[in-house]
Each structure stands twice: as structure tokens, then as C-alpha cells.
């Protein structure tokens, strides 16, 4: 497999800067395999080991679409819903969206079961 850079994936400039800020230098194999088709609007099923960048593999294309769609989605409506099997994974995915989307001026919420409504 060729050595790609995040710049070659044609991410929105704000996302590319966020990726650089996180210290990511080159995309992982799962990111190379999934980001381009997801950015084209195609469906993808990906499978990779823990710690290989799967969250970025789907979060970056989602955030890219939000960043580049015109007009921007309404601030009063949900644009994306990510479901995870555990609270811990939900928190990790939420943190990733927050980090990657920081320069996009987006709002995100984390909701999970097993606790009262107000702590969330």
C-alpha cells in the first residue's frame, strides 16, 4: 500500500489542521481504505483492530461533509447520530468528534443510558 498523507485525502482545511494538531502524520490503513469512499458518499463496512484509527476513519468524512456542505445544516437540528454499544466508547467517540471538529464551530452532545438526565 502506498504511503498517503492526510493532505492527499483532501480533507477540509480546518480538519487537516485539527489532524495535524493531534499529531497524526500519516493515515492508517483503515483510514486510507475508508475515508475516500465515505467522502464520495458511498457506504463502507470497515473492520480493524483496536487503536488503528477507526473513529477518525468515519468521523473525519462526516465532519468534512458538514464543513463543506452549503448551506450549513440548521443549528437547531441534529445532523449526525452515532450509536455505540457502550458508554465508554460513546465518550471516546464524542471526544474525537470534539477534537476533530473544534475548528468548525460545531456543537455536539453525548447521551447514554444508566444515569440521570441532568448529569449529561
For each of these PLM feature ranges, what is it?
Residues 2-120:
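SF2 DExD/H RNA helicase N-terminal ATP-binding lobe
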